[in-house]
Amino acid sequence: MRSDSARKGLEKAPHRSLFKALGFIDEEMERPLIGIASSYSEIIPGHMNLDKVVQAVKDGVRMAGGVPVTFGTIGVCDGISMNHKGMSYSLPSRQLIADSVEIVASAHAFDGIVLVPNCDKVVPGMMMAAARLDIPAIVISGGPMLAGNTCGKATDLSGVFEAVGAVKAGNMTEEELSELENTACPTCGSCSGMYTANSMNCLSEVLGLALPYNGTIPAVYSERLRLAKTSGMKIVDLVKKGLTPSKILTEEAFMNAITADMALGCSTNSLLHLPAIANEVGITID
């Protein structure tokens, strides 16, 4: 196993001592070491449930005979950061996310990795890292937010943006805007709609980096946790089979993703992210 380079042999006794400081026992030294990259935070609605998703992944890894270890990375909420100076930090965060996941996974010789993102730049950033690392990898996101219900009408975040203009134009009262503001985003999860997060989560399935329904099971459904547990089990299977992203992310896979992108009406930001992911495996999309 790849992790043997950090755990096996006489010269790795100090390394094993540090693993044992983490609570590892000798039996765990013989099992696949699975990293779990999480962008859990309390500032992004799409990420506030990721701790639950991570726990389900860990359970699945254990069930399949692996040893899970979690670590965190950053994330930016495009919705909160837009329309002020904060938006200038969003796209650069994608590169930092990819770099940070690569660094942790490489420095600690993980045998495989589970990527737990959810929002706009985090999903492609983690997929870029998976492609760059080329170790067995699987994506399981936090899932989309449920639609809101405002006075019996389905609503979402885009409706709140539109309502701001309606108030300025005199077509809506501030009281009506307040009611919409309070009801349009009713749960955790990536913003409801085919924005970048949901687009890239759907495309993660098409590219072959995620299990079916990763892009569509709502964040608040228990089915999301079941998928996370299954993903944890699957990564151990991928490690045993030696199935890495370079064997999955073919030119045909990217063409399929572009086709699905157009069929679903995905975010135009996919034009930024698909070529970046492809570049990590030496494929040019022009």
UniProtKB/Swiss-Prot annotation:
Note on cofactor: Binds 1 [2Fe-2S] cluster per subunit. This cluster acts as a Lewis acid cofactor.
KW Oxidoreductase (keyword) present: no
Residues holding Mg(2+): 78, 120-121
GO biological process, one term: isoleucine biosynthetic process
Leading EC class: lyase
Pathway: Amino-acid biosynthesis; L-isoleucine biosynthesis; L-isoleucine from 2-oxobutanoate: step 3/4; Amino-acid biosynthesis; L-valine biosynthesis; L-valine from pyruvate: step 3/4
Binding-site residues, [2Fe-2S] cluster: 119, 191
N6-carboxylysine modified-residue sites: 121
One Pfam family in the UniProt entry: ILVD_EDD_N
Enzymatic reactions: (2R)-2,3-dihydroxy-3-methylbutanoate = 3-methyl-2-oxobutanoate + H2O; (2R,3R)-2,3-dihydroxy-3-methylpentanoate = (S)-3-methyl-2-oxopentanoate + H2O
Known EC number: 4.2.1.9
Top-level lineage group: Bacteria
GO CC terms: cytosol
Classification via InterPro entries: DiOHA_6PGluconate_deHydtase_CS, ILV_EDD_N, IlvD/EDD_N
Molecular function GO labels: 2 iron, 2 sulfur cluster binding; dihydroxy-acid dehydratase activity; metal ion binding
Cofactor dependency: [2Fe-2S] cluster; Mg(2+)
Keywords, ordered alphabetically: 2Fe-2S, Amino-acid biosynthesis, Branched-chain amino acid biosynthesis, Iron, Iron-sulfur, Lyase, Magnesium, Metal-binding
Family: Belongs to the IlvD/Edd family.
Subunit structure: Homodimer.
Job description of the protein: Functions in the biosynthesis of branched-chain amino acids. Catalyzes the dehydration of (2R,3R)-2,3-dihydroxy-3-methylpentanoate (2,3-dihydroxy-3-methylvalerate) into 2-oxo-3-methylpentanoate (2-oxo-3-methylvalerate) and of (2R)-2,3-dihydroxy-3-methylbutanoate (2,3-dihydroxyisovalerate) into 2-oxo-3-methylbutanoate (2-oxoisovalerate), the penultimate precursor to L-isoleucine and L-valine, respectively. Is specific for the (R) isomer of 2,3-dihydroxy-3-methylbutanoate, with no catalytic activity against the (S) isomer.
Identification of the protein by name: Dihydroxy-acid dehydratase
Species of the source: Clostridium pasteurianum
Taxonomic path: Bacteria, Bacillati, Bacillota, Clostridia, Eubacteriales
